[in-house]
């Protein structure tokens, strides 16, 4: 399977309480070639949908009524298997440095502020998925015993 095909086959979970934001994210992702997109309009269902869908990438809005987006970010991050973490991209209208620091400290791999540039958004999504796929292959190679430090140049 080609690298681009593998990236486009990735499962993407989008969590946002705003239907317009879900529609925009799904439309941009579809235009970029992704077809396995699950949207979650009710953040209270996010954990259940995450466990059932087993995404390769999560796009998470932080500012949702009735739920602490940071707590959800932390919980999603803790659900990921330590040797196979699912990257989480935070989508937020909060441009403060405090919000960015807090999200990164809780495990977000990227932060995109709304409104976002669709071209940049597509590149960031592809980069995170490609990184996840590469780390997964590295992990599998390590389990198979094909990755060792012996290939390193002598220092």
Language-model region placement:
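Non-catalytic signal-transmission and effector/linker regions of two-component phosphorelay proteins
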Residues: 1-13, 26, 129-155
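Active-site residues of response regulator receiver
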Residues: 16, 61, 92
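Two-component/phosphorelay signaling modules centered on CheY-like receiver
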Residues: 19-38
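Acidic catalytic/metal-coordinating carboxylates
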Residues: 20, 41-45, 63, 68-74
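Alpha4 helix (beta4-alpha4-beta5 surface) of REC/receiver domains from two-component response regulators
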Residues: 23-27, 71, 84, 95-110
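The feature encodes the CheY-like receiver
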Residues: 39, 65-66, 70, 92, ...
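Short amphipathic alpha-helix used as the core "switch/output" element in two-component signaling
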Residues: 48, 70-83
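C-terminal output helix
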Residues: 98, 116-125, 129, 133
